[in-house]
Amino acid sequence: MAAKVITFMAVMVVTAFTANAKIPGVYTGGPWINAHATFYGEADASGTMGGACGYGNLYSQGYGVNTAALSTALFNNGLSCGSCFELKCINDPGWCLPGNPSILITATNFCPPNFNQASDNGGWCNPPREHFDLAMPMFLSIAKYKAGIVPVSYRRIPCRKKGGIRFTINGFKYFNLVLVTNVAGAGDVIKVSVKGSNTQWLDLSRNWGQNWQSNALLVGQSLSFRVKTSDGRSSTSNNIAPSNWQFGQTYSGKNFRV
């Protein structure tokens, strides 16, 4: 049910620097809201890899099976990528698991609308519905398989991630495509800037998902990155990519406090 997007290119992960420092302030999340949930992929969540956020292999990126594709109303044209939610199945004792356990997930994909079907009969992700298409293991953690679709209550929560924000630099000489992953706190990045050792701070434009681009010539310079999330907080990671950085490498910077 969720859209699949082929990742831009395979990357070689090189951890050049890891900063354990945290940014002052804490993202507090949001109120409980009613929605619905379905599932996609297989029992091992292999069908959820890739996706419209550009994260690629969700296992190697640290997201695992705790993921979901969001409907148009929640996806925000990709700006919601990386945001974290708590969900629980409600008001359906025949299909919800006993005790109404909750799950914690990260938004990694887009659940496209299906206007050939009514929004209450197959077009679950049609706007203005707020809907979560969960990785199968997550759905089975709150409801029975045969339910197919269940009512849920959800809320935004702070993202808890291990290590720093990761910056994977893809592209070529005059096209830098930076994938931003593993963001704690609010999780959803709304602005990315880069500074070479010979440049001022340069704002990147969002290409798709959480891939951000710059056409500046940055090869041969050490790089610093600044990330701003939807709660208004910023994280600056200075000189995390050395002057001999290569395309396809990943560098780890300063994360947000949780």
UniProtKB/Swiss-Prot annotation:
Disulfide bonds: 53-81, 84-159, 89-96
Topology of the protein relative to the lipid bilayer: Peripheral membrane protein
Xref: InterPro entries: Expan_Lol_pI (IPR007118), Expansin (IPR002963), Expansin/allergen_DPBB_dom (IPR007112), Expansin_CBD (IPR007117), Expansin_CBD_sf (IPR036749), RlpA-like_DPBB (IPR009009), RlpA-like_sf (IPR036908)
Sequence ranges assigned to domain Expansin-like CBD in this UniProt record: 174-253
Residue ranges annotated for the Expansin-like EG45 domain, each copy included: 50-164
Keyword Ion transport: no
Main localization category: secreted
One biological process term in Gene Ontology: plant-type cell wall loosening
UniProt subcellular location: Secreted, Cell wall; Membrane
Keywords: Cell wall, Cell wall biogenesis/degradation, Disulfide bond, Membrane, Secreted, Signal
Function: Causes loosening and extension of plant cell walls by disrupting non-covalent bonding between cellulose microfibrils and matrix glucans. No enzymatic activity has been found.
Family as reported in the entry's similarity comment: Belongs to the expansin family. Expansin A subfamily.
Protein name: Expansin-A9
Name of the coding gene: EXPA9
